[in-house]
Amino acid sequence: MTQTAQPDTVLIVDFGSQVTQLIARRVREAGVYCEIVPFQSADAGFKRLQPKAVILSGSPASTVDEGSPRAPQIIFDSGVPVFGICYGQQTMCMQLGGKVESGHHREFGRAFLDVNKDCALFEGLWSSGSRHQVWMSHGDRVTALPDGFEVVATSSNAPYAFIADEKRKYYGVQFHPEVVHTPDGAKLIGNFIHNIAGIKGDWSMSAYRAKAVQAIRDQVGDKRVICALSGGVDSSVAALLIHEAVGDQLTCILVDHGLMRKDEAANVVAMFSEHYNLHLLHVDASERFIGELEGVSDPETKRKIIGRLFIETFEEEAKKLGGADFLGQGTLYPDVIESVSFTGGPSVTIKSHHNVGGLPERMNMQLVEPLRELFKDEVRALGKELGLPDSFIGRHPFPGPGLAIRCPGGITREKLEILREADAIYLDEIRKAGLYDAIWQAFAVLLPVQTVGVMGDGRTYEFVCALRAVTSVDGMTADFYHYDMEFLGRAATRIINEVRGINRVVYDVTSKPPGTIEWE
């Protein structure tokens, strides 16, 4: 689905910063639609979107190097407000006649900003004479301002830390307002959008829903769509949105690989078939998957087998249905943003959904991706708008390869059943304790290790179960969840008493980094 020109849009020009997506998050949180466009195609992006405001991102590049990225001149000729962040501030200054030099003292981490002049961007937030914490990450710095600019705030190593040309509505900051380490950063971005650019902030999920439904109808017409439904939030929301648009022209296929959580496949089928009247084909392919996986211990080999078998199974079932012209996917915005190489051309790394990668080309289908403009939290909000229950929307992430990567070593049907039961008990205890929503992800792992135990009067030699729970904002970094010992004791006792095949339970206290959230 292609975003057409809309009056209240913010264009974010990406110069390759690792935190550009955070800028987009802050703009969306302010109720305003935005798009990230790499600097190489920013000229075309500006003409396509006709934005009400532009934000220039940071970059690992240096403005003083020959051939470093620049913003297209059309931005400065257009008269729209511009907000330059870090590198964005520096290139704006250079392009408008100022100077930038490599800093004598690099500034990374927390810094303090001294406000020495009132500014329209500070309204209701900062005032002259106040001091505020910000987050710096720069080596270069502005040393001479273009005509029309003035300094409104400084830091110890950045005499031009916050600059403004109030007449042209150009603002530049040396720090990063988009990160949480700048406490007032989101409000500054909000002030720029609402007060300076005059954008109302009325972009909502209900408005997006109506626009997306119409776009799907325009794209699909009277043709057929098939959608791979995994039971996850992304594919489920995409399927419901497509179904709302084209009704019975959509058929969903749930490939049950035998690696799902306890009763998960049955619950997904019941919810979508009974409550949403969605045409859903449930394919039990567990014998096929587990048969090929049995005895395979290398995690990457497991993933490849699962991916290959999924494509083969999905393709076979789709052909039985007579094929379709369109394939529905739950692709999200972070998956389609182009990564930027500031030393050459754009490096486009569009990820394929782990389950359906390669399918559109193999089956000669066009993609329908109604979520490709949304972040994960926005997809959850849209799911709520579509009527999905909170218990479903708020589910913890679950990997595509399923329990196969939570069973290190060789896989057998027996080990999967042991793990499935232990995992269900663990999650049940978490819900009973009221902890589910406080945890990003929690699951059990069945280790390829057996230990001696004593149950009753008998000796046992059974598997070890590891419990994992982490807190996180985005899954990129994570900390282990700090349970009290009473909870862990209760969960361990239930698992050992109720699951035949486990006689020892341990808790994983590894953070990410150095570990990963999943064990494989």
UniProtKB/Swiss-Prot annotation:
CDD domains: GATase1_GMP_Synthase (cd01742), GMP_synthase_C (cd01997). This is GMP synthase [glutamine-hydrolyzing]. Its EC number is 6.3.5.2. Gene3D superfamilies: 3.30.300.10, 3.40.50.880, HUPs. NCBIfam families: guaA_Cterm, guaA_Nterm, PRK00074.1. Pathway: Purine metabolism; GMP biosynthesis; GMP from XMP (L-Gln route): step 1/1. GO terms for molecular function: ATP binding; GMP synthase activity. Catalyzes the synthesis of GMP from XMP. One of its GO terms (cellular component) is cytosol. The gene is guaA. ATP binds at residues 230-236. It comes from the Bacteria. Homodimer. PANTHER family: GMP SYNTHASE [GLUTAMINE-HYDROLYZING], GMP SYNTHASE-RELATED. It is an enzyme of class 6 (ligase). It catalyses: XMP + L-glutamine + ATP + H2O = GMP + L-glutamate + AMP + diphosphate + 2 H(+). Residues 203-395 form the GMPS ATP-PPase domain. The keyword Nucleotide-binding applies. InterPro entries: Class_I_gatase-like, GATASE, GMP_synth_C, GMP_synth_GATase, GMP_synthase, GMPS_ATP_PPase_dom, Rossmann-like_a/b/a_fold.
